[in-house]
Amino acid sequence: PGIHPLADAMSLADIEAYPWPDISDPTRVAHVAAKTRRLAQDGRYAILGCPWLLFPFERAHAMQGLDTFLSNMLVEPEFAQAMLWRIEGLCKELMGHFLDAAGPELDIIKIGDDLGTQDNLMISPALYREMLKPVHADLISFIKSRTKAKVFFHSDGDIFDLIPDFIEIGVDILNPIQPGAGRMSDLARLKKTYGKDLVFCG
């Protein structure tokens, strides 16, 4: 019902009652093996894979509405965390199927979450570390247990304050360098401060 199907959800039971997509459906990754093989045979470029759905925070606030989900992160944290972990479970399941299909030719795997505005974060660093960082860390750990591909993390906005967290949880490539987005527009500073630990892209 409506554009935010869990806008009125209040309980853990509401989350479990929602008809989540069937990630086991093989048609979701049916094209991946052949396309990866073709790109590998071409041999001119690194191969980047980007499975659908792998942005837990974005999916959560799409399901509830941004204002509602941000409020729930503060006033109903158990509910908000359950939503994030439910979505992350789907992300991991899809990622597993995708990596199985892609095989060892994959060079880079893209995940992410838009966490910034043009001049700051959407949530505080403390709230990120409490609620979202464990979700991202678990997904990245799963990826690295299944592939040698580098982890490419996309997040729009000024996310400068979270860069040490991204490095800690295993992000290899951070995207984008975004003109007009505060400290994320200063490539020289980014490279000087974090260039030994992170590749900046885009």
Which residues does each PLM region occupy?
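Active-site loop segments of alpha/beta catalytic cores
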Residues: 2-3, 7, 15-202
